[in-house]
């Protein structure tokens, strides 16, 4: 799941993605046997809490997410629609369309973003990034500055590779995972330092009914996101989610410090995988 930032109101809404995928987006490398299950999911989002300083009275919205497998990589698509209601009676509406492609070896990543709202001009841009084994030095390019490369940290992760490594660490019983993560967003927000805490596997039980996509257990994961250029010890936001071994997220929360939202899975279906030679 990729983070969305709304500077006018002083907060961000995520895709882990960061998160998922931010938050919901993840990759495999050539040597890894794990495969993520292609699927399409719809999440309903609501405000959990808000400080009085935000003047927020409610947040509602929906996230439509899909993970599609291709023979040479994965395609992720996310469509957000969020409505922020304030005590003054004002309403802010944000719509975002995001799509990315990540190569199966984890070395290539491309993305496109289309964002609109009722308080800022429409925003459209795309870009791509390389990292080993495709190139010696990781770097990214953006359509708004096509002739200027953004250097990336040597050990940078793209979203899908980050989550598969996270899953591998969870399987081994490891609890902590720190990494630099590249998102498909604007250059000044494209790199975030992350600290992940991986909880003990929990029985799925009746928490999530997802048909053939339901796994016997999930890992509770919390990821804190930091600006690598800042010395602040407090994260910009934190993403907590239930991650199944097949890559499906059955529930997630995002905490921005002054307010938080959660996302309940309301619809999900498996998507076909390609037949590759």
Predicted regions and their residues:
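N-terminal secretory signal peptides that target proteins for export/translocation
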Residues: 1-13
């Amino acid at each position: 799941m990729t983070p969305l930032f709304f500077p006018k109101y002083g907060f961000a809404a995520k895709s882990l993605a960061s998160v998922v995928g931010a938050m919901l987006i993840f990759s495999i490398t050539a040597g890894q046997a794990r495969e993520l299950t292609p699927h399409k999911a719809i999440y309903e989002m609501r405000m959990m809490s808000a400080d009085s300083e935000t003047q927020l009275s409610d947040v509602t919205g929906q996230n439509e997410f899909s993970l599609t497998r291709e023979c040479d990589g994965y395609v992720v698509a996310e469509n957000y629609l969020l409505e922020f209601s304030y005590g003054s009676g004002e309403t802010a509406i944000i719509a975002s369309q995001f799509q990315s492609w990540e190569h199966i070896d984890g070395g290539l990543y491309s993305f496109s973003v289309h964002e609109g709202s009722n308080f800022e001009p429409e925003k459209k841009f795309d870009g791509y990034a390389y990292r080993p084994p495709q190139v010696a030095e990781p770097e990214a390019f953006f359509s708004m500055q096509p002739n200027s490369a953004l250097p990336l940290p040597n050990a940078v992760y793209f979203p899908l590779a980050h989550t598969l490594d996270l899953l591998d660490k969870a399987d081994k019983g490891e609890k902590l995972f720190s990494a630099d993560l590249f998102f498909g967003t604007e250059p000044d927000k494209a790199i975030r330092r992350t600290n992940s805490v991986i909880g003990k596997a929990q029985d799925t039980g009746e928490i999530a009914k997802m048909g053939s996509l339901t796994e016997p257990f999930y890992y509770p994961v919390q990821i804190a996101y930091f600006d690598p250029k800042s010395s602040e010890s407090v994260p910009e936001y934190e993403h907590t989610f239930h991650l199944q071994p097949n890559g499906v997220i059955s529930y997630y929360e995002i905490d921005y410090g002054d307010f938080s939202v959660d996302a309940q899975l309301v619809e999900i279906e498996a998507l076909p995988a390609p037949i590759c030679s």
